A protein has these predicted regions:
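Active-site mouth of glycoside hydrolases
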Residues: 1-156, 162, 167-169, 179-180, ...
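Residue-level marker of positions within ordered structural domains that often coincide
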Residues: 164, 217, 267
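Conserved active-site loop/cleft motifs that coordinate metal ions or position small ligands
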Residues: 186-187, 212-216
Length: 272
């Protein structure tokens, strides 16, 4: 099928240390109804996104650095010349979950480890609005605010970004990011309640030669159709709309028009 992938290596979207649980193999807990991600233990609650709760990740513990290094180097040596890997996303949303610059030292080291292994694929760490006064407000004032985002761009051979804003603010953000003179990929978008929709945005990305990974595919146990907890009470959010996912669990489209736009944009032709 000529499919490629972008592995995500580290992630700052995290819960408080007292809530952290090590992942396990085998059967997973059944989803809690109504929650994005299928769990009511989430980094997307109001305390973590807008309050004082600071997320924890294992690399916060100094003794985990050798483990992290071995992990990166093994991945790089095994897949660093594999054409199925399109790009390495070294760090997801650095600074999320009130973490500020806590991940800065490890982010720099992780990039260095990949480069020392001489992987053939480009490296990136996405920018997403770290340092903005409020995640929702940032969608109307996109920009680069936090030091950790400036470092992410400095380290990245391809500028990847997450943006769920409407059409006009998406155009504005493209203009900001084009100034860096590197290829652009939006690796998280498509949020119907925020008016980031396939019908308007996918043609925009194609017009500006912006790569695209949108969030969600077939609705299932991850329950990506539900909005994040911290936006449920915002006055202009229609929570009856699916946030992510484009197919029901029986593979029928959520919105047939979206599928037609996807097909058209994936054709090798200009649409403007």
């Amino acid at each position: 099928y000529h499919m490629t992938m972008m592995p995500v290596i580290f992630n700052d979207c995290s819960v408080a240390k007292r809530l952290y649980q090590e992942p396990v193999l085998g059967p997973q807990p059944e989803p809690v109804p109504g929650y994005f991600g299928g769990s009511d233990v989430t980094p997307f609650d109001d305390d973590t996104q807008n309050g004082d709760t600071v997320g924890y990740i294992p690399t916060d513990d100094p003794e985990m650095e050798p483990v992290a290094e071995a992990y990166v180097r093994e991945l790089a040596r095994t897949y660093g010349q594999d054409p199925r890997i399109l790009i390495w996303n070294v760090w997801n949303e650095a600074g999320n979950s009130q973490r500020g610059d806590k991940s800065m030292p490890m982010l720099k080291k992780a990039f260095a480890w990949f480069r020392e292994e001489d992987v053939m694929q480009p490296l990136t760490a996405d920018v997403w609005g770290a340092g903005a006064e409020h995640p929702y407000g940032w969608l109307k004032m996109p920009g680069i605010y936090a030091e950790i985002e400036k470092e992410a761009i400095a380290q990245s051979e391809i500028v990847s970004f997450h943006f769920y804003g409407d059409y006009e603010h998406s155009r504005q953000y493209i203009r900001i990011l084009e100034q860096y003179g590197r290829p652009l990929i939006n690796t998280e978008w498509m949020h119907r309640p925020y008016r980031s929709i396939i019908q308007t945005h996918l043609p925009l990305w194609k017009k500006h030669k912006v790569g695209s990974y949108f969030f969600g595919f077939v609705n299932g146990k991850a329950q990506f159709n539900f909005v994040w907890e911290f936006i449920k009470k915002l006055p202009d959010i229609d929570t009856s709309l699916w946030m992510h996912d484009i197919f029901h669990s029986d593979f029928t489209p959520y919105d047939a028009e979206e599928i037609e736009v996807l097909k058209e944009c994936n054709e090798d032709k200009k649409i403007f």
